[in-house]
Amino acid sequence: MLLQNIPAIAVVLKDKDVLSIPKEELKGADLIELRVDMFEKTENISDIFETAKRKYNLPLLCTIRLPEEGGKREIKNRVEIYQAVIPFCNFFDIEIFSNEAPFLRQLSIKNNITLIGSYHNFINTPSMEQLEEVFDRGKTMGMDIIKIATMVNEKKDIETLLYFTLRHKLDRIIVLGMGQKGIPSRIINPVFGSMITYASLNEISAPGQIHLKDMVHIFKVMGLRG
């Protein structure tokens, strides 16, 4: 894994962002998540990844989110796209409960790519027992990092996610709450073991996402950056 800082800040970009946003605007980012389901086009997709790699000189995470877990549109040839961008990627993200997850696990091992097994719940934050079941499934599948993102509707949801983070602080996890009420978790959880927090530049990819400049400033104030 090629992250210089942990916790790391991942900035989320689309294809048009790669073509238009200068390197200077990504100052403070440790990782770029390219959200293919948010791309305007998926033809010649490897060109976008190659450009991002050369232009920004940061590790790349390829994510092609399913609509049922927050994807903006359905991408039917997900496996083919993952295979096409292997030369440029350091990380893949795949839903733990997706049909392609076992194949992506083997593909990642073969190509020395860190695989993030993710779970997104846009309705609520499940119980601790249910979160543990998701975590156990991810571990059983051999995911390198397990990401859990849930909708925060009340204060106790923040507490549940923080407790889960503390419980697994020695594991490789990403834990965050979505929605306006989930914003504190994007700031607090990285202090206690969540490896990556996600930030936006223009369009947010999940409710409650914080702008990159604000997240970098927050990390500096909290002593997570020099």
UniProtKB/Swiss-Prot annotation:
InterPro entries: 3-dehydroquinate_DH_AS (IPR018508), Aldolase_TIM (IPR013785), DHquinase_I (IPR001381), Type-I_3-dehydroquinase (IPR050146). 3-dehydroquinate binds at residues 33-35, 65, 186, 205, 209. Its EC number is 4.2.1.10. GO terms for molecular function: 3-dehydroquinate dehydratase activity. The keyword Amino-acid biosynthesis applies. It is an enzyme of class 4 (lyase). It comes from the Bacteria. Keywords: Amino-acid biosynthesis, Aromatic amino acid biosynthesis, Lyase, Schiff base. The keyword Transcription regulation does not apply. One of its GO terms (biological process) is amino acid biosynthetic process. It holds the Pfam family DHquinase_I. The active site is at 120 (proton donor/acceptor), 147 (schiff-base intermediate with substrate). It catalyses: 3-dehydroquinate = 3-dehydroshikimate + H2O. CDD domains: DHQase_I. Pathway: Metabolic intermediate biosynthesis; chorismate biosynthesis; chorismate from D-erythrose 4-phosphate and phosphoenolpyruvate: step 3/7. Homodimer. Involved in the third step of the chorismate pathway, which leads to the biosynthesis of aromatic amino acids. Catalyzes the cis-dehydration of 3-dehydroquinate (DHQ) and introduces the first double bond of the aromatic ring to yield 3-dehydroshikimate. Belongs to the type-I 3-dehydroquinase family. HAMAP family: AroD. This is 3-dehydroquinate dehydratase.
